[in-house]
Curated annotation (Swiss-Prot):
Keywords: DNA-binding, Methyltransferase, Plasmid, Restriction system, S-adenosyl-L-methionine, Transferase. This is Type II methyltransferase M.CfrBI. It comes from Citrobacter freundii. PANTHER family: RNA METHYLASE-RELATED, TRNA (GUANINE(10)-N2)-METHYLTRANSFERASE HOMOLOG. Disruption phenotype: Loss of methyltransferase activity. The keyword Ribosomal protein does not apply. It holds the Pfam family N6_N4_Mtase.
Length: 376
């Protein structure tokens, strides 16, 4: 089903950006302002059934014209008011038009399905610059196992993740996304005389992303069923005693943090200059998408891997942040959930994994056989 047919099925009279611009232009002509403003990219707001047409002058957004999608009339209550637009038009200083640059077509990645076995901070160096189109991963938890510590210090853990974030920035295409599943971790108390600690890992990682050249885009919350967090033991003392100050909620959410490789280009640039219009069209998302940043997904269990994330989580991220035939990178591949979702959605993948045991799981799960390149 085409996007236009989708709009028609909703009862929209306005079904394209071209129509929205024409209606907005007629409105400006009535105000004698048609030569004062240009239009940004119109966007449809299917929650309120309106089109929003940005008004731009001297490179800055001045206001917007809001059009009722079902009646094709101007929504005067939501649009920028006429006196305001007239006042802004008087302030506009016209500058010579910039020479239109030659359109750059973004080339297709040369990579095929690939497994890199070894420490990802090192194996990622084998990949060419700007050769992947999306990074999605869930890094190992910091010292989550009570029987031993995997890292000498928390700083050592952050240093490892910084090196991976930095190398991913190099291999990620301009303006594309790095999506990471991460959550605060609970360090159990060593004795009855010590308190447990909860470390806010997502907020420390945010600082690393910003310092390494990414732009923060979104925070999504993966919501699990209510009973999912009781295994941590958090909240049991309060549940028994009910004393103030002891309250600790049971955590049933994890963060999905979305970053974009910093660029001066709008996201629309990545869409308009894509090498395959067919892939862009085939990647369009239907009406059953997640409307909010609360994603309710049941946790997954895999007896062969202690910390897998659900297939549904990988499926959503790949669908929302990549096109068909894109290359999806997971630097901490684990059992290969990201690879399986990538294949099912018509994408390619590059998986980094240090464990031979999990490499075998990925090979088994993707069922690609000889079509899968493995580099040690």
């Amino acid at each position: 089903m085409t996007v236009k047919n989708n709009y028609l099925n909703r009862g929209y009279l306005v079904t394209s950006t071209t129509q929205a611009k024409k209606i907005a232009k007629l409105h400006l002509e009535k105000l004698d302002l048609a030569d004062k403003f240009s239009f940004g990219l119109p966007e449809v707001d299917d929650r309120y059934h309106v089109w929003r047409v940005p008004l731009v002058a001297t490179g800055h957004r001045i206001g917007e014209i809001v059009i009722n999608s079902k009646t094709s009339t101007i929504d005067y209550k939501k649009s920028s008011k006429s006196p305001f637009l007239i006042k802004k038009a008087m302030e506009v200083v016209h500058t010579p038009k910039k020479v239109k640059k030659e359109k750059k077509i973004i080339s297709k990645s040369p990579l095929n399905n690939m497994l890199l076995q070894g420490n990802c901070a090192e194996t990622l160096k084998k990949l060419p610059d700007e050769s992947v189109n999306l990074v999605f991963t869930s890094p190992p938890y910091y010292n989550a196992k009570p029987e031993y510590s995997e890292y000498h210090t928390y700083d050592e853990y952050l240093s490892l993740l910084r090196s991976v974030i930095k190398e991913c920035h190099r291999v990620l295409s301009e303006g594309r996304f790095f999506v990471i599943n991460v959550s605060p971790v609970l360090i159990r108390r060593a004795s009855r005389n010590e308190a447990s600690k909860r470390i806010a890992v997502p907020f420390d990682l945010h600082r690393l992303f910003i310092e390494e050249g990414y732009e923060f885009i979104d925070d999504i919350h993966w919501v699990k069923p209510e009973g999912a967090g009781w295994a941590l033991g958090r909240g049991r003392r309060f549940a028994a005693d009910r004393n103030p100050l002891q309250y600790k909620p049971v955590p049933v959410t994890e963060y999905i943090l979305v970053y974009r490789k910093k660029t001066d280009k709008l996201i629309d640039w990545n869409i308009r200059n894509h090498h395959s219009k067919e892939d862009v069209f085939d990647s369009k998302i239907g009406d059953d998408y997640e409307k909010t940043n609360l994603w309710k997904i049941n946790p997954s269990r895999n007896r062969k891997h202690p910390a897998t994330f659900p297939y549904g989580l990988a499926e959503r991220v790949i669908k929302y942040y990549s096109f068909k035939n894109d290359v999806i990178l997971d630097p901490f591949a684990g059992s290969g959930t990201t690879a399986k979702a990538a294949i099912d959605l018509g994408r390619r993948f590059v998986m980094c994994e240090i464990s031979k045991q999990y490499i075998d799981l990925i090979i088994e799960g993707t069922m690609l056989g000889g079509d899968l390149k493995i580099i040690n």
